[in-house]
Regions:
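A structured beta-alpha segment of the ubiquitous adenosine-cofactor-binding alpha/beta core
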Residues: 80-119, 126-133
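Glycine-rich, phosphate-binding/catalytic loops in enzymes
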Residues: 41, 74-75, 139-142
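Glycine-rich phosphate/adenylate-binding loop
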Residues: 2-30, 34, 129-227
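Glycine-rich phosphate-binding loop and adjoining beta1-alpha1-beta2 segment
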Residues: 52-96
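Redox-cofactor binding/interface segments in oxidoreductases and associated redox assembly factors
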Residues: 122-125, 151
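Phosphate-coordination loops involved in phosphoryl transfer and adenosine-cofactor binding
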Residues: 19, 53, 119
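Conserved beta-strand segments of alpha/beta enzyme cores
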Residues: 55, 98-100, 148
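Glycine-rich adenosine-cofactor-binding loop
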Residues: 18-49, 57-65
């Protein structure tokens, strides 16, 4: 096996006295966890002397459903509201930020609008082939000044987080460029994810509402990890 050592340097644009633009695509289980942690990173950056901090936008067209209230940070009062809007409103009220929510999908129609400047960092928290393809297309074309694409994903038995530099107007082809998820794991763009080997949220809700059985125990979902 051949190992390639790469020395990577953070682009100077992220160290300037301006806000670092971050776009999070997906506000579900993974996306909501990522978004709720970004205010702490923003505070840490400012504490260490970065004058701009983060300017975060969240994009997701889905609304909160009853099943989302089991494994995602939403409550019954959020049902019917847009996920991205709920999360951003909550963060802005608590932290005093002015972050933005876009209750839309990242598709070709959005990419051709051209009314938003390229984010410095795109964080993909999606679980479908179509969504990853849309992100890859965006960071190569419309968002052609994006520095990094961080992909966070999982399937039934594994997961990954990959920080890459998409080939675009800012990132050119060179040996030290960080490869993206589409280059390292092309199957994530070619194949659909398999459902996790645990009962779906809807099944849990149905069982609780039927009154025929006790709520499922979490221990029944556990799996031994390989050594």
């Amino acid at each position: 096996m051949i190992f390639l050592r790469i020395e990577h340097t953070i682009p100077s644009g992220l160290l300037e006295n301006r806000r670092v633009r971050v776009l999070v695509v997906g506000a579900g289980g993974t996306g909501s966890a990522v978004v709720m942690g970004l205010p702490y990173l923003d505070q840490a950056m400012r504490a260490w002397g970065h004058r701009g901090g983060l300017d975060v936008s969240v994009m997701d067209a889905d609304v909160v459903t009853e099943t989302n209230c089991i494994r995602q940070p939403f409550s019954i009062s959020d049902i019917g509201l847009n996920k991205a809007t709920v999360l951003i409103n909550r963060i802005n009220m608590f932290w005093g930020t002015q972050w933005k929510a876009f209750p839309i999908h990242l598709d070709k129609r959005v990419q051709t609008r051209g009314n938003e400047s390229s984010p410095d960092i795109v964080i993909g928290c999606v679980d479908t082939r179509a969504a990853r393809v849309a992100i890859e297309s965006a960071v190569r074309t419309t968002f052609n000044m994006t520095m990094y694409w961080l992909d966070v994903g999982n399937n039934a038995a594994s997961g990954q987080y990959v920080l890459g530099q998409p080939l675009n107007a800012r990132n050119h082809r060179k040996a030290e460029r960080l490869r993206t998820v589409s280059e390292l794991y092309p199957e994530t763009l070619r194949e659909q994810r398999h459902p996790p080997p645990v009962p779906a949220d809807s099944e849990c809700v149905a069982g609780w509402h039927s009154g025929k059985s006790q709520p499922p125990r979490l221990t029944s979902f556990s799996r031994a990890l390989p050594r």
